[in-house]
């Protein structure tokens, strides 16, 4: 017991010591100088690299964080790690007001919430639902944090793009740690790298015209609670939110594929045909992944459109794209571990998300919402 407590107290210092450089060690001053010339978007996308993704995930999906269950010590340590990353990138605090619904961390990076959880969202048919319900309990008060990394834009700064991933997972049951390397450690580290790429751009004089909010959320595994709290209590006006790009499970292959050159896109054309077209064009010009839409059909029996954090934005008529690699045999199991992750796959998809966000943030006119449903 004492050894366990010492480990928990010691871990934040270890985590923060690994985040003591303002930017990635892999980016030199010569790199920054070269980035300032030429086609900035693709050059900054290349600062998103396997080595940094792997470094972050080895920490966030380690046993020491005990599965990052919302409300537990491991989730709090993960939140601190993410916040520290934002601070070291030079991202200032953005949350400065408090009311009875939204309490904030003194440094202004946390949006705290306390919500009663009544359900758990399971994304597959064969996961052990009875076990998951027993693990979480029902109708309990959940305390969590969304971590906000706000990168202010220039001439169109009142509008913003929100990039989300959930950093919580299933936690620990008896002696078993559910590391959640793919679900959703993969999306979380992607968000951290996107934040770095945008801040490198800003440092070099190429900051986004629209503001960009990088927001790793918690409470997803409890029923999309963190993102729901944000859309119910937005820090920035929802009417100024151009789009939400949500990243959830991008580090593995599903049973339908034997190569990594694919990603499922869900939701891109549900509210804005223009968002879908931009996404397709960005991929065609820069990345070349196979963009697959089998889970985007309205009659999809899996109903993935309703089952990750983007849906809380879509409910508010904000266009969304959900980036997803599909379900695999280790989903919601203790075997969802770092050594099974394809980091090159994460790198490629993360660059696609960044380049799509770059286009949305820098185009003259915000995308048109032409498919509003009541």
For every predicted segment, state its role.
Residues 38-47, 63-73, 132-138, 175-184, ...:
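Second-shell loop/turn segments in exported
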């Amino acid at each position: 017991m004492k050894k366990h407590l010492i480990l928990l107290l010691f871990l934040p210092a270890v985590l923060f010591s690994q985040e003591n450089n303002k930017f990635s060690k892999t980016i030199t001053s010569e790199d920054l100088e070269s980035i300032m010339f030429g086609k900035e978007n693709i050059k900054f996308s290349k600062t998103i690299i396997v080595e940094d993704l792997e470094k972050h995930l080895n920490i966030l999906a380690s046993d020491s964080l005990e599965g990052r269950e919302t409300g537990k010590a491991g989730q709090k340590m993960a939140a601190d790690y993410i916040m520290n990353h934002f601070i070291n990138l030079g991202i200032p605090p953005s949350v400065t007001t408090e009311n009875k619904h939204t309490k904030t961390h003194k440094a202004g990076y946390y949006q705290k919430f306390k919500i009663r959880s009544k359900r758990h969202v399971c994304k597959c048919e064969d996961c052990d639902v009875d076990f998951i319900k027993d693990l979480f309990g029902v109708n309990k008060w959940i305390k969590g944090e969304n971590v906000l990394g706000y990168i202010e834009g220039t001439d169109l700064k009142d509008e913003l793009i929100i990039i989300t991933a959930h950093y919580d997972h299933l936690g620990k049951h008896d002696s078993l740690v559910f590391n959640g390397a793919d679900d959703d450690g993969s999306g979380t580290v992607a968000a951290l790298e996107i934040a770095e790429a945008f801040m490198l751009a800003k440092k070099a004089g190429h900051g986004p015209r629209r503001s960009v909010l990088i927001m790793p959320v918690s409470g997803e595994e409890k029923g999309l609670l963190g993102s729901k709290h944000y859309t119910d209590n937005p820090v920035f006006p929802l009417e100024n939110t151009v789009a939400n790009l949500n990243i959830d499970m991008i580090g593995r292959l599903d049973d339908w594929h034997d190569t990594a050159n694919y990603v499922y896109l869900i939701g891109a054309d549900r509210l804005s045909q223009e968002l879908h077209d931009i996404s397709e064009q960005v991929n065609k010009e820069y990345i070349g992944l196979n963009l697959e839409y089998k889970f985007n059909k309205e009659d999809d029996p899996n109903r993935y459109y309703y089952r990750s954090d983007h849906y809380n934005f879509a409910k508010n008529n904000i266009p969304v794209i959900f980036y997803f690699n599909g379900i695999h045999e280790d989903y919601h199991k203790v075997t969802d571990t770092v050594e099974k992750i394809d980091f090159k796959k994460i790198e490629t998809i993360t660059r696609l998300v960044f380049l799509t966000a770059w286009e949305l943030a820098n185009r003259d006119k915000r995308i048109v919402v032409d498919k509003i449903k009541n």
